[in-house]
């Protein structure tokens, strides 16, 4: 799945959100995916920021608009605007901090409260490079993903392990849902899901795609 550099030309624009506790590595996952950068001194995100990257999927240029916000409670006031229009999410926890995994259910509930319940969600166990410090096993991550019908990967933003794969898988699944619905409807779907367009892509009519647990950690 190749990257695509002409950022102003695309066939589809999908909004993704990064969620999870502060300090789990959301910002570094974003910078690794969009700019291939990692910052050891990365501080907690203040407010909201987003970045974009385009990929070529099945011959179509898919532009991802990925939003990142701090996980700290005092920023919860931005919740509604943050989630609005999102068709995919990466729910991130730190494999070395079990408390960040324990809050995953709360983050998932909040996500589903503000979006379609069948939004494409990838559960991410980040910082897999810190193998000697792991407190959340791969099996625990898989079990939670299976229970909640999520996709699952373990990543390392530091070592760039599975970062591209995780984002690409989410975008691919969204595109497949949109494409299938377009074929069934006999027309071409809207290319944009940006909130200002007043349009969202409703994925609940093809929930069977999401209700199959898929482990992507290999």
Curated annotation (Swiss-Prot):
One GO cellular component term noted in the UniProt record for this chain: plasma membrane
UniProt cross-references to SUPFAM superfamilies, sorted A to Z: P-loop containing nucleoside triphosphate hydrolases
GTP-binding recorded as keyword: yes
GO molecular function, one term: GTP binding
Lipid-acceptor residues (S-geranylgeranyl cysteine): 215-216
Binding site for GTP: 20-27, 68-72, 126-129
Keywords noted in UniProt: Cell membrane, GTP-binding, Lipoprotein, Membrane, Nucleotide-binding, Prenylation
Compartments where located: Cell membrane
Membrane association type: Lipid-anchor
The organism's place on the tree of life at top rank: Eukaryota
Database matches in PROSITE patterns: RAB (PS51419)
Motif (Effector region): 42-50
Record family assignment: Belongs to the small GTPase superfamily. Rab family.
Record protein name field: Ras-related protein Rab11E
Organism whose genome encodes this protein: Lotus japonicus
Gene: RAB11E
